């Protein structure tokens, strides 16, 4: 009720305007909707304040009109009329009233008033026939819906006779007749091959709009057949988009609906040539949307649709530029959307015939050449997009010079051969509101921009522009809201001293700007919402004037050379900041030692600076909103303060590579929403916390500290990544509480002892396992073949990417909404160090591009332990493994031939063990193998050759004196070489036990022969026998003398 009174008061203000202003309303807004009305009211009231010549008067007509508007609002609300209801006809009526016609109101519009008031006395509910039909429709719909979703099928539709079906969801009725005029059925979980029985819609004789985006396969009517839709003689709008299962067999049904003015078949997976001939009877069609399918030419048959004004063929696979000849014959077109197809070649000259065309979108094709000269005939053109094409050579704007109505122009090229032809004379007659010329190898700003006065969005990014930033664009265009100049070669940024502008989005990142940020930037741009000046060469202090940017929500100045302390005015004045990125600079001093005004801060990144001292209490200003905090790579000292656990909204915390001491506060790891915590590279001591908080998988980095004691079993309950490398942890490998979530486990360089737990075999989602440089002993469990070491349903990224559409709408039409999209990303890069190919490298994940190297790394490192026994042949089933390192242990027996199944292996290190036998010839099938090291073992036989083995040098085989052949300098016996080549190395596996048997036999024979010889010698009387007996007697006498 309060809303209705406000509308009434607004209307009274509306009619207190001049006749000329009222005439403008009549011409441009014959039907005013609510939000447009409020905008107009504000606009007109502003203009009245600027004009003192207009006297505010209130006519009787205005009062009557306002009352009618109020009554219509009240009744529309009571009758459940959506989208305007009675507002539209009454607004159309009262918008014709002004002060001059007010006196003639009762005479000229009396009949309309009588008819209107006659209809206001009551609202009609839905008729019984249609209520029953709706219940039948619901029953049928439930029969084709999956059982799991039955409770969601039109829950407000019930069989209560007191229930007004006009109030049901998805329904709109005519307020006077009570007849259904709109039926909307959204996405549903339907059974396969579900067909809609159109005869169920026949009772709705006055329906005007059918929206069936539900997942149907088609239509059926066993009585009327293809002619079924002709029963709906008032049907004007048919929306069948997003069904995804339709094909061309529905077109005969649609062709019968000859009253249609709007048809949408968007996103239905329709393939092949579209049979336009099958909808040739839709002669009243004004809008046709076939976007997001897999359609291709020819387009013959489109010419039958002579009244068509809007055609959307975007996101298909049309390719031949000659197919547009058919489109050129459609001279009544207002909008033509052909973006994201595969059109190749130059634009045809015939497009110039479409002199009524207002919107033309040709973006994301493979067009080349230049604009046709005939484009100068497109006198109605308002919107032209040529983004993401393959334009080359000189590109001229001359064909657009006389297009006085042009408001939006967009151009970019996938080729680096494009050169923009610039003009020196101001001959262009258009006044643009949006200009986008990006990725065009532009070296000079087009001169026509100097004469534009109404620009609201300018995007000149990804070019080769140099010199001064074009701040003159601000002076010339007071309504400019968005200025994007990133990825250029600008070197100087100077702000005019006197300017104060309304600019809200400024991006000049990735340039070559050096020197100081302008001192007056905060005064000149006080209304900025977002500013990105990252990846430049700025130096010096932050200007204190930035504290005047009270509305700024995002500031990114990372990757520069700023220095000094953060200005006090900055940390107290920018109270709207949500995202602050100052990474990779030289800021110094204590970090936020006092309270700040950052009460809304969600993301704070100050990593890789020179901040010193303890972690400042200023962080507590945003204790409930702060989600991302990165203070890594600074010079922070002291303990980790216990109050940091009050930052209850933290999801990412990184304070690695500082000089923090003391123990880890258990309450810090108990924060409920943490997804990543990195405390590595400090001087932390004490034991590990017993558990971590959070409901999701946590990535925990504690490596390179001085932590001691055992690893608690409960610590592993919720982790996805656990990095404990290079501490002083002891005890055995913990019992894993939850083995499903862990996919990176790194425990290198500790003092772990005992055998390898068989629970390691339950790490089914593991990608990287590093237990090297410990004191583990015993056998390698053969059950390790259970490990996946391959792509699973896990990913290494941490963070969010938020897409936000700003409130600006620079242009809007049937198919096009030109607004400004802001993407805010809060990704945290993950660094994992792992030994591969004889190097200890870093592998990164969690970048914004989702092609992280870390996502493709699968490895196992058990080196530098005390493991013994045989290498389990079952390890050969780890086919996705890229790295295996078993070096520096006490492993014996032979190399399993099953290792030939390691198809993706790149690095295999078995060096410094006690392996015997030969190298299996089958290993030459490992086509990805780059590093192979079996040095310092007891291997023998011929070194295999072929494929990757031809690339390995002698270092791979050092310390194996019984190996022969290339690349060693030891030759092999010719016969042995022949035998081994014939046997393919398979018999070599049996050589080890045969050689050992011969060794044992020869040793025993020698021992027995020696004993027999001594015995025989004693049986003969000879000087040797007597000498031996004397020695024995002397020895006995000596022993007796020693006894008491």
Swiss-Prot record:
Localization terms from the record? Cell membrane
Protein's UniProt keywords contain Iron: no
Swiss-Prot/TrEMBL keywords? Cell membrane, Glycoprotein, Leucine-rich repeat, Membrane, Receptor, Repeat, Signal, Transmembrane, Transmembrane helix
Which segments carry the LRR repeats? Answer: 204-231, 232-255, 257-281, 282-305, 306-329, 331-354, 355-377, 379-402, 404-427, 429-452, 453-476, 478-500, 501-525, 527-549, 550-573, 575-600, 602-622, 623-647, 648-671, 673-695, 697-716, 717-740, 742-763, 764-787, 854-877, 878-901, 902-926, 928-951
Q: How does this chain sit within the bilayer?
A: Single-pass type I membrane protein
Q: Where are the transmembrane segments?
A: 997-1017
Q: Which residues form the signal peptide?
A: 1-22
Instruction: Tell me which residues are glycosylated.
Output: 159, 197, 267, 390, 402, 532, 551, 561, 586, 623, 646, 751, 786, 885, 925, 938, 969
Q: Which Pfam families match?
A: LRR_1, LRR_8, LRRNT_2
Supply one GO CC term from the record.
plasma membrane
Regions of biased composition (Acidic residues) lie at: 980-990
Against InterPro entries, the record matches this protein to:
Leu-rich_rpt (IPR001611), Leu-rich_rpt_typical-subtyp (IPR003591), LRR_dom_sf (IPR032675), LRR_N_plant-typ (IPR013210), RLP_Defense_Trigger (IPR051502)
Residue ranges for the region (Disordered) are 969-990
Which stretches face the Cytoplasmic side? 1018-1044
Q: Residue ranges, Extracellular compartment?
A: 23-996
Similarity field: Belongs to the RLP family.
Q: Which PANTHER family match?
A: RECEPTOR-LIKE PROTEIN 14 (PTHR48062), RECEPTOR-LIKE PROTEIN 8-RELATED (PTHR48062:SF52)
User: What is the protein named?
Assistant: Receptor-like protein 8
């Amino acid at each position: 009720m309060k809303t209705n009174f406000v509308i009434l008061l607004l209307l009274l203000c509306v009619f207190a305007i001049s006749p000329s202003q009222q005439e403008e309303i009549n011409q441009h807004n014959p039907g005013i909707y609510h939000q447009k009305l409020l905008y107009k009211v504000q606009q007109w009231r502003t203009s009245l304040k600027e004009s003192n010549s207009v006297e505010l008067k209130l006519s009787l007509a205005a009062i009557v009109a306002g009352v009618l508007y109020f009554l219509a609002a009240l009744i529309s609300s009571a009758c459940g009329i959506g989208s305007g209801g009675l507002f539209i006809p009454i607004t159309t009526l009262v918008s014709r009233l002004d002060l001059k016609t007010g006196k003639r109101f009762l005479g000229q519009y009396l009949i309309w008033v009588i008819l209107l008031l006659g209809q206001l006395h009551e609202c009609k509910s839905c008729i019984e026939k249609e209520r029953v039909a709706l219940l039948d429709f619901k029953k049928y719909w439930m029969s084709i819906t999956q059982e799991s979703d039955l409770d969601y099928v039109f829950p407000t539709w019930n069989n209560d006779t007191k229930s007004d079906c006009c109030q049901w969801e998805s329904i709109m009725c005519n307020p006077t007749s009570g007849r259904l005029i709109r039926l909307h059925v959204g996405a549903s979980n339907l059974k396969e091959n579900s067909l809609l029985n159109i005869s169920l819609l026949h009772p709705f004789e006055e329906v005007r709009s059918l929206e069936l985006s539900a997942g149907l396969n088609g239509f059926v009517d066993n009585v009327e057949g293809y002619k079924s839709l002709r029963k709906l003689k008032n049907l004007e709008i048919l929306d069948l988009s997003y069904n995804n299962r339709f094909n061309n067999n529905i077109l005969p049904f649609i062709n019968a609906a000859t009253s249609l003015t709007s048809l949408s078949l968007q996103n239905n997976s329709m393939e092949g040539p579209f049979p336009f001939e099958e909808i040739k009877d839709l002669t009243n069609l004004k809008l046709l949307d076939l976007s997001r399918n897999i359609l291709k030419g020819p387009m013959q048959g489109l010419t039958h649709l002579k009244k068509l004004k809007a055609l959307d063929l975007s996101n298909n696979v049309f390719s031949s530029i000659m197919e547009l000849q058919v489109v050129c014959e459609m001279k009544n077109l207002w909008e033509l959307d052909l973006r994201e197809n595969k059109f190749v070649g130059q634009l045809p000259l015939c497009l110039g015939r479409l002199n009524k065309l207002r919107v033309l979108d040709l973006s994301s094709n493979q067009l080349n050449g230049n604009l046709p000269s005939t484009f100068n005939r497109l006198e109605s053109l308002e919107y032209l997009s040529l983004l993401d094409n393959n334009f080359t050579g000189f590109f001229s704007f001359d064909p657009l010079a006389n297009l006085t109505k042009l408001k939006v122009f967009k151009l970019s090229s996938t080729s680096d051969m494009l050169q923009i032809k610039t003009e020196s004379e101001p001959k262009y007659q258009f006044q643009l509101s949006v200009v986008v010329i990006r990725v065009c190898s532009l070296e000079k700003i087009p001169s026509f921009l100097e004469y534009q006065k109404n620009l609201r969005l300018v995007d000149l990014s990804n070019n080769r522009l140099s010199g001064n930033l074009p701040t003159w664009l601000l002076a010339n265009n007071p309504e400019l809201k968005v200025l994007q100049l990133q990825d250029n070669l600008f070197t100087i940024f100077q702000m005019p001293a006197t300017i104060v502008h309304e600019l809200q989005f400024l991006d000049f990142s990735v340039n070559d700007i050096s020197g100081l940020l302008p001192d007056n930037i905060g005064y000149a741009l006080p209304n900025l919402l977002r500013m990105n000046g990252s990846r430049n060469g700025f130096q010096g202090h932050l200007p204190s004037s930035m504290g005047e940017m009270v509305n700024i929500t995002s500031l990114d100045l990372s990757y520069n050379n700023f220095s000094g302390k953060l200005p006090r005015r900055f940390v107290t004045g920018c109270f709207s900041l949500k995202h602050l990125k100052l990474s990779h600079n030289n800021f110094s001093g204590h970090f936020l030692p006092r309270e700040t005004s950052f009460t809304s801060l969600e993301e704070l990144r100050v990593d890789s600076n020179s901040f010193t001292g303890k972690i400042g209490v200023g962080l507590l200003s945003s204790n409930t909103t702060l989600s991302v905090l990165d203070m890594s790579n600074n010079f922070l000292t002291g303990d980790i303060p216990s109050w940091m656990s009050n930052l209850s909204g933290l999801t990412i915390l990184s304070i690695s590579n500082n000089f923090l001491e003391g123990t880890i506060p258990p309450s810090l790891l108990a924060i409920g929403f943490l997804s990543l915590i990195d405390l590595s590279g400090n001087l932390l001591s004490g034991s590990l916390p017993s558990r971590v908080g959070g409901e999701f998988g946590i990535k925990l980095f504690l490596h390179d500290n001085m932590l001691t004691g055992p690893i608690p079993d409960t610590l592993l309950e919720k982790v996805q990544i656990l990095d404990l490398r290079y501490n002083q942890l002891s005890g055995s490998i913990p019992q894993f509480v939850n083995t499903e979530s862990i996919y990176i486990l790194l425990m290198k360089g500790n003092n772990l002892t005992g055998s390898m737990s068989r629970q390691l075999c339950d790490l089914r989602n593991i990608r990287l396992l590093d237990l090297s440089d410990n004191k583990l002993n015993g056998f390698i469990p053969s059950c390790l073949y259970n490990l996946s070491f391959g792509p699973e349903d896990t990913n290494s990224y941490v963070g969010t990417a938020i897409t936000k559409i700003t409130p600006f709408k620079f242009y809007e039409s049937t198919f096009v909404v030109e607004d400004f999209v802001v993407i805010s990303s809060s990704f945290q890069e993950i660094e994992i160090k792992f030994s591969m190919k004889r190097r200890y490298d870093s592998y990164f994940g969690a970048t914004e591009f989702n092609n992280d190297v870390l996502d493709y790394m699968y490895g196992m490192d058990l080196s530098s332990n005390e493991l013994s026994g045989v290498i389990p042949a079952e390890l050969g089933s780890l086919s996705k493994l890229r790295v295996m390192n078993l070096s520096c242990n006490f492993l014996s027996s032979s190399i399993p031939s099953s290792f030939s199944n390691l198809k993706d292996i790149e690095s295999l290190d078995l060096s410094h063990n006690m392996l015997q036998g030969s190298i299996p010839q089958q290993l030459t099938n490992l086509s990805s193998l780059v590093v192979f090291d079996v040095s310092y073992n007891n291997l023998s036989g011929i070194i295999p050759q072929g494929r990757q083995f031809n690339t390995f040098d002698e270092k791979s085989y050092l310390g194996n004196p019984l190996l022969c052949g290339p690349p060693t300098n030891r030759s092999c016996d010719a016969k042995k070489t022949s035998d081994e080549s014939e046997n393919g190395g398979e018999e070599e596996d049996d050589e080890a036990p045969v050689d050992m048997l011969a060794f044992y036999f020869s040793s025993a024979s020698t021992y027995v022969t020696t004993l027999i010889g001594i015995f025989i010698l004693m049986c003969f009387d000879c000087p040797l026998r007597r000498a031996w007996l004397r020695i024995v007697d002397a020895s006995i006498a000596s022993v007796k003398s020693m006894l008491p």
